[in-house]
A protein has these predicted regions:
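Short, aromatic- and glycine-rich surface loops/edge beta-strands on solvent-exposed regions
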Residues: 141-147, 424-434
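Edge beta-strands of extracellular beta-sandwich domains
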Residues: 409, 435-442
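Non-cytosolic beta-sandwich-type ligand-binding/adhesion modules
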Residues: 2-165
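Conserved active-site-adjacent core of cysteine acyl-enzyme catalytic domains
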Residues: 41, 217-356, 410
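Noncatalytic regulatory segments and standalone regulatory/sensor domains
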Residues: 4-23, 32, 53-56, 87, ...
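Surface-exposed, short loops/turns at beta-strand junctions within beta-sandwich domains
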Residues: 133-137, 417-425
């Protein structure tokens, strides 16, 4: 693994920390922290605090988590750093920062990345950043996890933390690509999805490509609303996106990468998503130019699925969700141009490895009940209860007649009914704000 990664993911690893109202379950992956139980009921609240972790000097840091959060549970991940800085009198000083939060996470809550500020450090949505000038750095951290349940019959579980960090050293320049390597990945355009969110779902579209390669059969909007950060009011929180992948059982994390680590993943059969900034206008001097790019963007996520050499020039093979159709998503970018665009995107990469635990998806079977034959109005039933179709609850409703090749988008009639002219051999997906997707097979 890259030298800028630190893992906590085994029974022995978790034992090094302090567990308050928590236990380590050896039957989940290689070990996972869960709430302790009393008389077969889980305690409502627990805290894990890691040992002090020594790292190389860093200015920025990411903490990813792999977890399961059943309905009624959530977790919050925090970090603090031991920071070296010069005080107002130019004296060298060392001090722990305050505990800062990467946010409250759960698959069935309104996730939020909001964090209080500190005079030494801050969290900017998904990055822990040391304040001050380039000489203000840290080399020690601790992480803390708060686990909570409102239903004492279930507990959240955390099976892995991954820390990635970077300093002020220059990024790694081009390295030799030994041979062509291209991984099959489905191609999805963000621009043919729900028109209300098409311009801002590059990240969940990329995550969906990576997961559907593994036959998860996810819908882009389903992924998007499962990653949505209600404080950031956006779908692009890096840590929330990989946390969603982990909620399906996958080992996943965000890494400050370089070409060496990108090559490591591709040649191990793992495509990755990366953060870039680029322009397709050669006269635009604000962003790095990429020939054949579909747009100009101040921040974007795409999938890297391979390397290729043609006529002596190295290329990366990508699935860029900014392509206007599924057929135009796969593209080849010159490696040198891609490097510059990726560097401007902080060299972020989403890494998704194999599934470590089996976790059921968040889909619930539903059925249709005809309410008005003349106007073809239907209610949606879930276990004999009518589903709320108001905009307060429903995020997106999709219908497909061709097994998901194409979708139409539905707006409920009067917040209560679906108007269906033709329900022959269709499947309807209702994505709720409760973290579940309700599926009607017509």
């Amino acid at each position: 693994m890259n030298e800028n990664l630190f893992f906590i993911n085994t029974y022995e690893d978790f034992l090094l920390g302090n567990l308050e109202n928590l236990s380590i379950d050896k039957n989940i992956g290689t070990g996972a922290i869960v709430l302790s139980s009393n008389n077969n009921k889980y305690i409502e609240y627990g805290i894990y605090t890691s040992q002090v972790i020594n790292l190389k000097t860093f200015k920025r840091l990411l903490v990813s988590w792999n977890c399961e959060t059943p309905k009624g549970t959530w977790i919050e991940i925090q970090a603090r750093a031991f920071i070296s800085y010069y005080d107002d009198n130019e004296n060298s000083t060392y001090e722990w920062s305050d505990w800062l939060s990467f946010g409250k996470w759960g698959t069935h809550i309104k996730r939020s990345s909001k964090s209080p500020d500190s005079h030494l450090a801050k969290i900017s949505t998904d990055e822990f950043i040391i304040k001050g000038n380039y000489t203000d750095t840290a080399s020690k951290i601790q992480i803390r996890a708060l686990l909570h349940t409102e239903n004492t019959n279930v507990t959240p579980s955390i099976r892995q933390f991954v820390i990635s960090y970077k300093d002020n050293t220059p990024h790694l320049k081009s390295i030799e690509i030994p041979s062509d390597k291209i991984i099959d990945v489905p191609s999805y355009s963000q621009y043919i999805r729900d028109k209300n969110i098409v311009s801002v779902i590059c990240s969940p579209t990329s995550i969906t490509m990576l997961l559907n390669r593994r036959n998860e059969n996810l819908i882009v909007e389903e992924t998007a609303w499962s990653c949505f950060d209600y404080d950031y009011e956006a779908f692009g929180n890096w840590l929330f996106n990989v946390a969603f992948a982990s909620s399906l059982g996958y080992e996943s994390f965000v890494e400050y990468g370089n070409l060496k680590s990108l090559k490591r993943e591709i040649y191990s059969e793992y495509p990755v998503a990366v953060s870039v900034k680029y322009t397709n206008d050669i006269n635009n001097l604000e962003y790095p130019y990429i020939e054949n790019a579909p747009i100009t963007t101040a921040g974007h996520i795409l999938v890297v699925r391979g390397f290729e050499k043609k006529d002596g020039i190295d290329y990366v093979v990508v699935n860029d969700p900014a392509g206007k159709s599924n057929e135009s998503v796969t593209r080849r970018y010159k490696l040198s141009e891609f490097e510059s665009a990726w560097h401007r995107g902080s060299n972020i990469m989403y890494v998704i490895h194999d599934k470590k635990v089996e976790i059921n998806n968040n889909r619930i079977e539903a059925s249709l009940e005809l309410k008005n034959n003349k106007e073809n109005l239907y209610s949606v039933l879930v276990n004999d209860t009518y589903l709320d179709l108001s905009s307060d609850f429903v995020k997106t409703i999709l219908i497909t007649y061709d097994n998901g090749l194409t979708f139409e988008y539905l707006v409920p009639y009067n917040n209560h009914y679906l108007a269906l002219e033709n329900k022959n051999k269709c499947v309807i997906y209702i994505i709720g704000s409760d973290g579940f997707t309700y599926v009607c097979n017509c």
